[in-house]
Every structure is written in structure tokens, then in C-alpha cells.
């Protein structure tokens, strides 16, 4: 097996530490542990080019710290589900603006189909190369694939 060429951070915000168990009617019954296998199925041999590093925090400061660490480590890209901070955090948006890491915003549910109007806005998306939402846990694998293609075609 070859050495991965790309390091991607899979960053998850508040209340996303129990995916697969938390509100399965909204977020599905599959957890993040399924993502590497989904990436392999979706991308085939190209999946071997990617190292995935998963991090979840319930606090805004810890997410900012991890983004800054990714910047310092020259991480190649970020798949970011900021959870509720998507709709409220100027601090995370400001961090993404300065670290300038290629980022795909990801959501398990379709935030624009949710009933709460606040969930229809994103401070994260304006600093992302793209947004993937509404495909359950598969949204993460789709985001990894999109980020990989974005970086390879930049």
C-alpha cells in the first residue's frame, strides 16, 4: 500500500460525537466509523491517496484550535460539519478565512429543508470550496471525494 499523498481533517462540531445514536430520524443510524469504508467504495484505489484524521469538539474554541493546528501542520484540506455553529459562529468563519485551507462544508441533513429558518444560513459555506448536505453519513465520503478532486484539479 502506498503512502497517502493527502491529509484531510474531518472536523465535527457540537453534538456530533454520537452520530448513529443521536436522533436517527434526522441523522440516520450510521456512525462516522462507516466513513473510511464509504470513501474506499466511492473512490476505489484513489482512497489510498488520502489519510483521514477525525476530530470532534463541542466547544467553539477547540474547533478553532484544531483548525489552527491543521494550518500549522499543512493539512491538505478539511471536511467540516460545524453543527449548530454553522449558523452562528463568526469566530469559526474568521478562522477559516485566515487559514485558507481548502474546505468542504458538510451536513448529514439538508439544512435548507429543516423547519427552523436559522438553519438555512451558513457562516462556514462562504469560506468553503463547496457544500454537501442531505445524504446522511455518506455526505462525508462525498465531501472527501469532492475535496480530493478540487485539490487535484487546482
Where are these regions (language model features)?
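Extreme N-terminal starter segment of soluble prokaryotic enzymes
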Residues: 4-8
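Short glycine-rich anion-binding loops that position phosphate/pyrophosphate groups of nucleotides
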Residues: 14-16, 83-86, 109-111
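Short, acidic/small-residue loops that bind anionic groups at enzyme active sites
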Residues: 96-114
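Short, hinge-like loop/turn segments at secondary-structure boundaries
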Residues: 70-72, 96-98, 120-126
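Active-site histidine-anchored catalytic micro-motif
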Residues: 89-91, 98, 134
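Glycine- and acidic-residue-enriched helix-capping/strand-helix junction motifs
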Residues: 19-34
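Short, glycine-/small-residue-rich phosphate/pyrophosphate-handling segment
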Residues: 53, 104, 113-154
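Helix-adjacent hinge/juxtasegments
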Residues: 46-94
Amino acid at each position: 500500500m502506498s503512502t497517502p499523498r493527502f491529509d484531510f481533517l474531518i472536523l465535527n462540531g457540537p453534538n456530533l460525537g454520537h452520530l448513529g445514536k443521536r436522533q436517527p430520524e434526522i441523522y440516520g443510524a450510521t456512525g462516522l466509523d462507516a466513513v473510511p469504508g464509504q470513501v474506499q467504495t466511492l473512490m476505489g484505489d484513489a482512497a489510498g491517496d488520502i489519510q483521514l484524521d477525525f476530530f470532534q469538539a463541542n466547544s467553539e474554541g477547540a474547533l478553532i484550535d484544531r483548525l489552527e493546528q491543521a494550518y500549522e501542520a499543512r493539512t491538505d484540506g478539511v471536511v467540516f460539519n460545524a453543527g449548530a455553529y454553522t449558523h452562528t459562529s463568526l469566530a469559526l468563519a474568521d478562522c477559516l478565512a485566515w487559514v485558507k485551507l481548502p474546505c468542504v462544508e458538510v451536513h448529514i441533513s439538508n439544512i435548507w429543508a429543516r423547519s427552523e429558518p436559522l438553519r438555512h444560513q451558513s457562516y462556514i459555506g462562504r469560506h468553503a470550496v463547496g457544500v454537501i448536505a442531505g445524504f446522511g453519513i455518506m455526505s462525508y465520503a462525498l465531501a472527501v471525494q469532492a475535496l480530493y478532486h478540487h485539490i487535484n484539479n487546482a
